[in-house]
Amino acid sequence: MRQLADIPHPEAKITLFSWNGKYLIKLEKGPFEQTYKVSEMDVTSEADVRDLLDEAFLAAALARFQAMAADLHAAFQRHDL
């Protein structure tokens, strides 16, 4: 796996990788991470992958981090942990 770029964002760490014919977009926030795989056949360049990271996509991903935290918290509560 080859790291192509760190993409600055104020709320999450975003890293772009190339691996096995795919671009991997990795978003990290606290203890959570999301990885999106984009086939190199679906885009023409790394710039196209960066274009996918528009305001709507990032807003949805950040909301998903909140949902992930809520899900984990609820699981801890259900099991009295």
Which residues make up each language-model segment?
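A short, structured beta-strand/loop element
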Residues: W19-S45
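Mixed-charge, Lys/Arg-enriched low-complexity segments
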Residues: D42-L81
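Amphipathic, interaction-prone secondary-structure segments
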Residues: R2-L27
